[in-house]
Amino acid sequence: MIGMAEKKVKVKTPSGKEAELAPEKVWVLAPKGRKGVKIGLFKDPETGKYFRHKLPDDYPV
């Protein structure tokens, strides 16, 4: 369920800026028997802090 991806996504960083970043890790977060959401782990280029953000449904896992 955890994959690596290179496709860039427009996300809002913790510092409040919009940036186009590629997630370092992608996984699906889903309750049993229901459709899940895709979550990506991103690294803020300015501060170096990691943060999570929801990805579009058509994003490859």
Curated annotation (Swiss-Prot):
Q: How is it modified after translation?
A: Methylated at multiple sites, to varying extents.
**Chief subcellular location:** cytoplasm
Compartments where found: Chromosome; Cytoplasm
Q: Which GO terms describe its molecular function?
A: double-stranded DNA binding
State if Calcium is listed as a keyword: no
Q: Name one Pfam family in it.
A: Cren7
Task: Say if the entry is tagged with keyword Zinc.
Answer: no
- Tell me which GO cellular component terms the UniProt record holds: chromosome; cytoplasm
The UniProt keyword set, sorted, is:
Chromosome, Cytoplasm, DNA-binding, Methylation
Under the subunit heading, UniProt states: Monomer.
Known function: A chromatin protein, binds double-stranded DNA without sequence specificity. Constrains negative DNA supercoils.
- Entry's HAMAP family? Chromatin_Cren7
Q: Which family does it belong to?
A: Belongs to the Cren7 family.
- The name on file for this protein is Chromatin protein Cren7
Q: What is the lineage of its organism?
A: Archaea, Thermoproteota, Thermoprotei, Sulfolobales, Sulfolobaceae
